[in-house]
Amino acid sequence: QVEHAAKITNDNKIVSEFSFMIGLPQESIEDMLKTVDFIKKLKKIGEYVMTQNVQLYRPYPGGELYNESVRLGFDAPRNIREWTTGKLLEIGGFVKPEYLPWLRNDNKKAMVIRYVTTLLFWDSGRKWESKVTFWWNWVRRAAYAILNGTFAIRRKLDFWALPVECQAVDIIR
């Protein structure tokens, strides 16, 4: 249904934007890679199909996933003050993979998450964008092509050690 909606809106030159989440408890690496593949498939539909930067799952109270996160060792803030100070405030309210126990020591999942949440959106840049941003988007697309190639090689070889491209992204930012 999502693909169909994307095709219809693109054919009618209506911008559609889709959002995704990754890093849920019990999510397999295969599921994460399927998400990557689906996002790429959507983006190929046309220039009016866009995706937001993929978000890493953030455990919030009040649901089964939150309870499962706590059971898996998530060190949840215990009161409102803790939700607004400390480690969550340091990272702008967004949880880093190292704060989620089911991701903390899994280099493969951490690399996939880093790729999906940081690099996958870099290839945006549509012909209808302003000319002011064209040059910067050209540079971003070139960097994206290199980093995307690196990710493809990692995926093919199933090699997830030495995450140098993550450090490169931090420098580029």
Describe each model-derived feature in a short phrase.
Residues I22-E30, G46-Y99:
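Flexible glycine/acidic-rich beta-alpha junction loops that bind and position SAM and/or redox cofactors
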Residues E64-N67, P77-R173:
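Radical SAM enzyme core and accessory elements
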